[in-house]
UniProtKB/Swiss-Prot annotation:
<dbReference type="InterPro" id="IPR036264">
    <property type="entry name" value="Bact_exopeptidase_dim_dom"/>
</dbReference>
<dbReference type="GO" id="GO:0045148">
    <property type="term" value="F:tripeptide aminopeptidase activity"/>
</dbReference>
<feature type="binding site">
    <location>
        <position position="199"/>
    </location>
    <ligand>
        <name>Zn(2+) 1</name>
    </ligand>
</feature>
<dbReference type="InterPro" id="IPR010161">
    <property type="entry name" value="Peptidase_M20B"/>
</dbReference>
<dbReference type="GO" id="GO:0008237">
    <property type="term" value="F:metallopeptidase activity"/>
</dbReference>
<dbReference type="InterPro" id="IPR002933">
    <property type="entry name" value="Peptidase_M20"/>
</dbReference>
<keyword id="KW-0482">Metalloprotease</keyword>
<feature type="binding site">
    <location>
        <position position="142"/>
    </location>
    <ligand>
        <name>Zn(2+) 1</name>
    </ligand>
</feature>
<keyword id="KW-0479">Metal-binding</keyword>
<keyword id="KW-0378">Hydrolase</keyword>
<dbReference type="InterPro" id="IPR011650">
    <property type="entry name" value="Peptidase_M20_dimer"/>
</dbReference>
<feature type="active site" description="Proton acceptor">
    <location>
        <position position="176"/>
    </location>
</feature>
<comment type="function">
    <text>Cleaves the N-terminal amino acid of tripeptides.</text>
</comment>
<keyword id="KW-0031">Aminopeptidase</keyword>
<feature type="binding site">
    <location>
        <position position="177"/>
    </location>
    <ligand>
        <name>Zn(2+) 2</name>
    </ligand>
</feature>
<feature type="binding site">
    <location>
        <position position="79"/>
    </location>
    <ligand>
        <name>Zn(2+) 1</name>
    </ligand>
</feature>
<keyword id="KW-0645">Protease</keyword>
Length: 410
């Protein structure tokens, strides 16, 4: 199993599937289509049925039941795309067997070193096989680790028919990283009673609470004149953007928050004197606090418009997803089964809120309750990203055990 995980994962991450926030196609990048087509062929090779890929790039497949019991249909999902935060082109995965727990030089030429000082969890992977980047790209373990685990688990169940299970549906979705994953997901066609996203992090992660999330795009319009004669004429759009940011609470940013604390995050700022554009994400677990944060942004914009003119600041703000806890609580047994599956495999479940979102956040509100399970990755979205193959193997075992337990309890 370990070799299959390594072979599939290292092959998958070499395919550039970064999504693109600026694109309006579905999926937003051709790499996701290419990857989806490959997975369709490999799902068929494994022996799954009803393998489809629709016009929007959503891949679905079925592992038929091998029991006569009336077992609910379970889904397992992962996403095709990788993050936009750092380059995902020309990924060169580096395999470190029997890791010694010490610093790893990822790139000697660029002096990129993965150290326990910067990443204290690193020594806990001593003895594991870990896969890192070469220091020039992200790895793409988010979410190609989860995707690989689903593929390997399905292959394992096909070749071990003594493990009884109900019908299992698999889906791989595009554009999760930019919040559009479930936008065109056909819940009815998928046909599962509930599902699990394999999109978590370290060993034991079991998550069924997510942020309420919104995105805010602000356009600041200035007036550019020669700086030598600019008095009472110039309006600097970049300074307007700085002023807006200054109104937000400094301590309510990602770098100062944890646990159940929400934040405002300036994701990007580009521009000049004439025009500047800022993109923020707004996050909070509590719905009332979430709404209050959005109102705060609107109020700041209103104040600035009163001060500088209506056209000085233009706000576009949209909700992205909501806390899935509300939809999962009524079917709590799907969390309990996953919890029991982990315990039976000597994995200590680590239940904590997702300081982010998964496809499950939106799918839960579309009628498909979907908690999230660990995959074994660390330091997502950057050059220090890595994954433990040993933990990936545990994730495969959890998928298999969840399927087995639902059949056993039917």
């Amino acid at each position: 199993m370990k070799q299959e995980l390594i072979e599939r994962f290292t092959r998958y991450v070499k395919i550039d599937t970064q999504s693109n926030e600026e694109s309006h196609t579905v999926p937003t990048t051709p790499g996701q289509i290419e990857f989806g087509k490959l997975l369709v062929e490999e799902l068929k090779e494994i022996g799954l049925t009803e393998v489809t890929m629709d016009d929007n790039g959503y891949v679905m497949a079925t592992l038929p039941a091998n029991t006569d019991k009336d077992v609910p249909v379970i889904g397992f999902l992962a996403h095709l795309d990788t993050a936009t935060d750092f380059t995902g082109k020309n990924v060169k995965p580096q395999i470190h067997e029997n890791f010694d727990g010490n610093a790893i030089t990822l790139n000697e030429e660029l002096n990129v070193v993965l150290t326990p000082e910067q990443f204290p969890e690193l020594p806990s992977y001593k003895g594991h096989t870990i896969i890192t980047t070469d220091g020039t790209t992200l790895l793409g373990a988010d979410d190609k680790a989860g995707l690989t685990e689903i593929m390997v688990a399905m292959n394992y169940l096909v070749h071990n028919p003594q493990i009884k299970h109900g019908k299992i549906r698999v889906a791989f979705t595009p554009d999760e990283e930019i919040g559009r994953g479930p936008a065109h997901f056909d819940v009815e066609a998928f046909g599962a009673s509930f599902a699990y996203t394999m999109d978590g992090g370290p060993l034991g992660g079991l998550e069924y609470e997510s942020f309420n999330a919104a995105g805010a795009k602000l356009t600041f319009n200035g007036t550019n004149t020669h700086p030598g004669t600019a008095k009472n004429k110039m309006r600097n759009a970049t300074k307007l953007a700085m002023e807006f940011n200054g109104y937000l609470p400094v301590e309510e940013a990602p770098e100062y928050t944890e646990g159940y604390e929400g934040f405002y995050h300036l994701l990007s700022l580009n521009g000049d004197v004439e025009q500047s554009k800022a993109y923020y994400i707004i996050r909070d677990f509590d719905r009332e606090n979430f709404e209050a944060r959005k109102h705060n942004v609107e109020n700041i914009v209103k104040q600035m418009q009163e001060k500088y003119g209506q056209d000085a600041v233009v706000l576009e703000m949209n909700d992205q997803y909501y806390n899935m806890l509300e939809k999962i609580e009524p079917v709590r047994e799907i969390v309990d089964i996953a919890y029991e599956a982990m315990k039976s495999l000597n994995i200590e479940p680590n239940i904590h809120p997702i300081r982010g979102g998964t496809d499950g956040s939106q799918l839960s509100y579309m009628g498909l309750p979907t908690p999230n399970i660990f995959t074994g990755g660390e330091n997502y979205h950057g050059k220090f990203e890595y994954v433990s193959v040993d933990v990936m193997e545990k994730a495969v075992q959890v998928i298999v055990e969840i399927a087995r337990r639902f059949e056993e309890q039917a």
